Amino acid sequence: MKKTMHLLVILLVLSCCNKKDDDTPVNPIDQLPPATQTGENTFGCLLDGEAFLPGPGPLTLDCVYQFVSGDYYFALKADKEINLNLVGVGLGTQKLQIEEGKTYELEELHDGNAVGRYAFEIFTNYTSTSHSGEMSITKLDMEKNIVSGTFWYDIEDQDGNVHQIREGRFDMTFSE
């Protein structure tokens, strides 16, 4: 009987031990999706050192690559709510055809350029010559409408704060 009581006490103590229930990785980069190239519709980056993933809900992740009036336009955006504010990160081209295996400088928003985008509520800002970055297209499949790549950039917001977007990756199916 005494052995049974000891065993019950040990089992009770062990069952009360608190294993961390949250298995979310603590390293922000480990929270990002893997860099795939199969059209998984994934997007992630580090925004000022914190993991940025599209938020739950409709219209939080969108990708288009279109040929309009003789020119190509690429647009990728991801949005999420942070502290009750809508925050968006994205990439795009204006009258610029993208190609697999090519790296593009993210600079000012004008014809022939690739740009990075940061949005906070109603304000949208784009990369510039003084706050720039790069986007690399690692896969472009026009038959399956898949575009994948990596990116990083610095961007200044409407208040003059410079945000660092790092370790960005995307694997999207795009609409035309």
State where each predicted segment sits.
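C-terminal or internal capping secondary-structure element at the end of a domain, subdomain, or sheet
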Residues: 133-176
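Bacterial Sec-dependent N-terminal signal peptides
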Residues: 15-39
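Short, isolated positions in well-ordered beta-strands
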Residues: 52-53
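Sec-dependent bacterial lipoprotein signal peptides
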Residues: 1-17
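Surface-exposed helix/loop patches within compact recognition domains
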Residues: 57-143
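A short, compositionally biased
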Residues: 36-41, 69-72
